[in-house]
Amino acid sequence: FSGIGVGYLFSIRTSRDPFMCFSATASFLTAAVTGLSGAAAVSRTTERRELPLAAVPLFFAVQQAIEGALWLTLPVAAQGTTCQALTNSFLFLALIFWPLYAPLAAMAMERDPLRRRLIGACAVVGLGAALYLASVLLDGTHAAIIKDGHLIYDSQPPPSGAVGIFYLIATGLGPALSSHRAVNLLAIIVVLGSVVAYVAYWDAFVSVWCF
């Protein structure tokens, strides 16, 4: 989740910078795989405090399904209300939902008081990032287009790239502070992977991170 959101925030400096994914087939396939894994994780959860984290793949599946629908809708009704609704829904999940949900999911699992407070601080940072990005989405204009085989999101005005740091604190650092090894290892991989993808695959940053 942090790779997708940070990719958007750091890559949209101008309307020409791309935020992309591969195809409808790839998006729907990813949605199916992550949805099934999320359903399995939720069904095997034995404690309520683990449910928010177990449900993460389900939300990601919804996000990928939205992109798949955009791939199918854009060629036939690019200016229609359906495309705009799909675009806004994807950006809501990518930019507003994840910086709130990720640290709260990690905090729900945490039993160590100090770690809970630290993760809670990351959640506050995420709230600030989400509120700022919500204002950007409400005040600006946003469109998805297919160009050169990629799905590109164009926002005017573009959000400040600096907010990407706060987004990464919420979605990456928050889970990394967990006492659960699987959670913080995943967070570390996400953060380091996003840096590597940003440096090595600038033009295709989010194409790399969608999967």
Map each language-model feature to its residues:
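Membrane-proximal helix-loop-helix units in multi-pass membrane proteins
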Residues: 105-170
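Hydrophobic cores of alpha-helical transmembrane segments in multi-pass inner/ER membrane proteins
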Residues: 28-37, 94-107, 163-175
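Loop-to-transmembrane alpha-helix initiation sites
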Residues: 205-211
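Alpha-helical transmembrane segments in multipass membrane proteins, preferentially the mid-helix core
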Residues: 36-41, 139, 154-188
